Design a protein with these regions (language model features):
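Short alpha-helix
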Residues: 195-211
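A short His-aromatic
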Residues: 142-146
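Short conserved AdoMet
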Residues: 83, 148, 162, 208
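Conserved N-terminal segment of class I S-adenosyl-L-methionine
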Residues: 1-133, 137, 141, 154, ...
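A short glycine-rich, Lys/Arg-flanked "PGG" loop and its adjoining helix->strand segment in the class I
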Residues: 151-163
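A C-terminal cap/extension of S-adenosyl-L-methionine-dependent methyltransferases
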Residues: 182-183, 216-279
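Short, glycine-/aromatic-enriched active-site segment of Class I SAM-dependent methyltransferases
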Residues: 170-196
Length: 279
């Protein structure tokens, strides 16, 4: 299996997040004080986030106390949120050492056992055997698109699911308008993503497995500048900061105009998501 990004990249990525979180109480290791949380009960909340947590997840995550594991779990914010909102028991599998430490710190600060963060390579045979059919929910966000053979990665997700368990996989959509924008801000980000699966038809094919029954598969959200990344201390970085501020009134506008109906499109939607059940 060929990874489009390596361990060194992710160690560096989470080292930066970890160091900034230690010096700034509003950063990612303090989710209860984050800017995202402060906006969560306002119209300025991210529209894709609103659709996911107020429309999509409540429909399919309607049982409590289920064991959920996230593949590539650092920094652990989403697992903490799933625990708080849906009363799920969170676990994470993370192979970056700095990512594991950040995830564990987030768990500790939110009363979750840090030993639930598993420091291992998800692709290893050890993980496949030890955790086969162990979880009620297996999820990953922005993970499978970093491989050139994502269908094999999906199979490894399924392997960890109990029968009747729920598979949730989401990826960014870096095609259409989003491709143009991300290429402008930092083309390296494009290079470490598998763009072929960022099309609904191709994405759906990844889950053509007799062990799965599809519940939902689609784009979600609309224009979202928070999808993009730029190298620090560049013109693009400061320009992107401006666009992210501009995003706030757009979020309010989308909520008012579209509500929970959404405005999905292959051109502007920032994400695709699959939800299915292991039969």
């Amino acid at each position: 299996m060929t990874k489009l990004s390596d361990k060194k990249y992710w160690d560096s990525h989470y080292d930066q997040k970890s160091s900034s979180s230690e010096s700034n109480s509003n950063e990612i290791s303090h989710p209860k004080k984050s800017i995202d949380d402060k906006l969560r009960n306002t119209l300025f909340r991210g529209y894709a986030d609103y659709l996911l947590w107020e429309k999509i997840f409540p429909k399919y995550l309607n049982k409590k106390k289920l064991k959920v594991v996230e593949i590539g779990s650092a920094p652990g914010k989403e697992l903490v949120r799933l625990h708080e909102v849906f009363d799920l028991e969170p676990y994470g599998i993370e192979y970056s050492e700095s990512g594991v430490k950040l995830n564990q710190r987030n768990f500790v600060e939110n009363g979750i056992n840090p030993e639930n963060v598993i420091h291992a390579d998800f692709l290893s045979e050890e993980i496949a055997k030890k955790y086969e059919s162990s979880f009620d929910i297996v999820m990953s966000r922005g993970f499978i698109e970093h491989f050139d053979n994502p269908e094999e990665i999906v199979k490894k997700h399924i392997n960890l699911l109990k029968k009747g368990g729920i598979l949730i996989i989401s990826i960014p959509n870096l095609r259409g308008f989003n491709y143009i924008m991300q290429r402008f801000f930092d083309n390296h980000v494009i290079q470490i993503h598998n763009l072929n699966i960022m099309d609904k038809a191709e994405f759906e094919k990844l889950f053509d497995d007799e062990r799965l029954s599809v519940s939902f598969c689609n784009y979600y959200g609309t224009l979202n500048f928070n999808l993009f990344a730029a190298k620090k201390k560049t013109i693009g970085y400061f320009l992107l900061l401006f666009f992210k501020i501009l995003q706030l009134p757009f979020n309010a506008l989308f909520r008012i105009v579209f509500g929970k109906h959404g405005a999905e499109s292959k051109i502007f939607s920032p994400y695709l998501i699959y939800i299915g059940v292991r039969t």
